[in-house]
Amino acid sequence: ILQMLNINAVCKMLFLKMSSKAEILSTIIKNRRSIFPESYIQQEIPTNIIEQILESANYAPTHKLTQPWRFTVIRKEGKAKLGAELGRIYKETVPAEKFLQKKYDSFGQKTSQAEVIVAINIQFHEDKVPNWEEIAAVGCAVQNMALTAEALNVGAYWSSPPLIDHLGDFLGLAENEKCYGLFYMGYHNAEQREANRTPMADKVKWIEG
């Protein structure tokens, strides 16, 4: 009887532990928001925190284990170089009649406000899997990063301006690699916003027979 009681106690403890883990994960998922650079404060993100956020990306699902995510970490003086490069690309690619000085200036402002910027790159393996699967895998990897950042109280958001199509040389990308966005990060003072979501029941169909 004592042995059975012990087994029941262990099972109950395991259930409570698993329930707690699920609740913690659900809270992190539901609290995650895009936090923009204007809310960032000038506080350094330690290297080990950056590495922890990146490491979480490495456990995203990936068909045939191609692990297509490739990241370029940009910080310190590198941020100004990125801002200047984005400004240069904008100036060279936008028609003169559509050029906006405010838009041009915003690239340098955003990169300077962020503490760290991670270029999100994809390495394609067309001989192994379709490109869309690699894109989906990297999307999962970035979600892991966003959730880990939320858990560590680091603000983050994934920016994908059209200019990223021209960042290959700046980032030193190979022919089978492409930039799919910039992941801005920084400690912040933004207030928690309510999630703007319609009911999940409106987006699900069940087939049971």
Per-segment meaning from a language model:
Residues F15-Q113, G209:
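N-terminal amphipathic, basic helical "cap/leader" segment at the start of enzyme domains
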Residues S19-I28, F36, G181-G209:
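C-terminal helix-cap and adjacent tail motif
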Residues A57, V118, F124-F170:
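Small-aliphatic-rich amphipathic alpha-helix that forms the alpha element of a beta-alpha
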Residues F170-Y180:
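Short, electropositive alpha-helical surface patch
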